[in-house]
UniProtKB/Swiss-Prot annotation:
Disulfide bonds listed in the record: none
GO (cellular component) term, any one: cell division site
Family of the protein in this entry: Belongs to the FtsP family.
UniProt keyword annotation of Ribosomal protein present: no
HAMAP family attached to this UniProt entry: FtsP
Keyword terms: Cell cycle, Cell division, Periplasm, Signal
Superkingdom field: Bacteria
Gene Ontology molecular function, alphabetical: copper ion binding; oxidoreductase activity
Post-translational modification, as annotated: Predicted to be exported by the Tat system. The position of the signal peptide cleavage has not been experimentally proven.
Position of the signal peptide: 1-27
Species classification: Bacteria, Pseudomonadati, Pseudomonadota, Gammaproteobacteria, Enterobacterales
Protein name: Cell division protein FtsP
Length: 471
């Protein structure tokens, strides 16, 4: 809808009085220091506590609003565990409605995955013991409540879950949390003039906002030492995909995807991050020049004026994070390692091929809505299958309990940053995946595969995966 003459005059007057932009836009001109979520580490014999509860947070300036949080703050603490650990995790629900939680990317059996079979009632707890038996990876824990995943994630039930192993600890990569190794949880929201998040699910497609938030604030900065800086990126938006660049055009070095390290660092000038995807990048700050990680073009003045009268899907600011180097260059700096892991090889033959069609116009997956009493896919532990997935509307897609390689996208080789093991992929028409089934599940505790456009998943674009142990 375009602005009529009266609206334009009104908007012009409001903008002049308010400094030419609404509150959400003004906040982008006053960058805040990047909030660093607290770090929770697994200790032998000590449980980890994650409590879902109401809290207060300021998305714009100092004006705090009531939100959902974990352990008393918006977004949860970063959890760090180690390959070989057995982690007792205690989820506590102190909200006034049922919540289900899961850990995206964690390789555990179906009974420990969470979700619909492990709904936590108000005042209730769930205390799984999680065997950590996988390579290093940046995972994430989040709400997975049936038909309520979109609003629960939007409200703030999200956090990072880091797995480390002997390889990741031995490599010369930045690993000092909050010093040269930073978690970035990226979301888009719509804020009113008091900084309160608004959520109105659309009748079709997924929700998009006009305010870009990183760790819960707009346009943050962080001071870093000169040298390599590691950013662990999570797109926790409901449906928006980001294409990221550095403001001065320098390259980013991608070192990891959803399921862990790539075989070798990949230098790229732009990087896609779909909902639910995680990537790790290294940025060389040794030259001592400030740089900003951005996500596309921001709204112009007419788009901002229009946003006073109608919801906008154009981001007011596209600044993700500004890196400000400080201090002197160390006498000795580590070179970027040429190799990180051995090449990805799938052992064994492809047991079968399956096709799936996602769509907004065609409800569900292959025309079927999610049914918790139906097994949509049954396979065996250790098998590899070819999955060909079509999407009428561009969207991300996630599979629990597996890892996969992207064999092709629209008939072409995948982007270089998609060369590693993954569990989430962006689909714009067609992708071909080689899916390796890592963990067992059952009808009582199935894995899910679903659209990562969360509103579509809540409407039924979800299927159930049963992985039977080999006889």
């Amino acid at each position: 809808m375009s602005l009529n003459r009266r609206q334009f005059i009104q908007a012009s007057g409001l903008a002049l009085c308010a400094g030419m932009t609404p509150l959400a836009a003004k906040a982008s001109g006053n960058p805040a220091a990047l909030p660093i979520p607290p770090l929770l580490e697994s200790r032998r014999g000590q449980p980890l506590f994650l409590t879902m509860q109401r809290a207060h947070w300021a998305f714009s300036g100092d004006r705090k609003t009531s939100i959902w949080g974990i352990n008393g703050r918006y977004l949860g603490p970063t959890v760090r565990v180690y390959d070989g650990d057995d982690v007792k995790l205690i989820y506590s629900n102190r909200l006034n409605e049922p919540v289900a939680m899961t850990i995206g990317g964690l390789q555990v059996p179906g009974p420990l995955m969470g979700g619909a079979a492990r709904i936590i009632s108000p005042g209730g707890d769930w205390s799984p013991v999680l065997p950590i038996r996988q390579s290093s990876a940046t995972c994430w824990y989040h709400a997975n409540t049936p038909n309520r995943m979109a609003p629960h994630i939007y409200n703030g039930l999200v956090g990072l879950w880091l797995v480390e192993d002997s390889t990741s600890k031995s490599l010369p990569l930045p690993n000092h949390y909050g010093v040269d190794d930073f978690p970035l949880i990226i979301q888009d929201k719509r804020l009113d003039n008091f900084g309160v998040p608004l959520y109105n699910p659309p009748s079709s497609g997924g929700f998009v906002g006009d305010s870009l938030l990183v760790n819960g604030v707009q346009s943050p900065f962080v001071e870093v030492s000169r040298g390599w800086v590691r950013l662990r990126l999570l797109n926790a938006s409901n449906s928006r995909r980001y294409v990221m660049r550095l403001s001065d055009g320098r390259a980013m070095n991608v070192i990891a995807s959803d399921q862990g390290l790539l075989p070798a660092p990949m230098a790229v000038n732009q990087l896609s991050l779909a909902p639910g995807e995680r990537r790790e990048i290294l940025i060389d700050m040794s030259q001592g020049e400030e740089v900003t990680l951005t996500a596309g073009e921001s709204a112009g003045i007419m788009d901002r004026l229009r946003g006073l009268f109608e919801p906008s899907s154009i981001l007011i600011s596209t600044q993700i994070l500004t890196l400000k180097p400080t201090g002197l260059l160390p006498l000795v700096t580590d070179n970027l390692p040429m190799r990180l892991l051995a090449d990805n090889i799938i052992e064994g033959s492809i047991s079968r091929t399956r096709e799936f069609r996602l769509g907004d116009s065609l409800p569900g997956i292959n025309g079927a809505m999610w049914d918790m009493t139906r097994a949509d896919v049954q396979t065996q532990l250790g098998r590899c299958e070819r999955w060909i997935i079509h999407a009428d509307t561009p969207q991300a897609f996630h599979i629990q309990g597996v890892k996969f390689l992207v064999r092709s996208a629209n008939g072409r080789p995948p982007a270089v940053e998609d060369s590693g093991w993954k569990d989430t992929v962006w689909i714009d028409n067609d992708v071909e995946l080689l899916v390796y089934f890592m963990q067992p599940s059952s009808m009582a505790f199935p894995f899910l595969y679903y659209s990562q456009t969360l509103e579509l998943a809540d409407r039924g674009s979800t299927g159930q995966l049963i992985v039977q142990s080999a006889m």
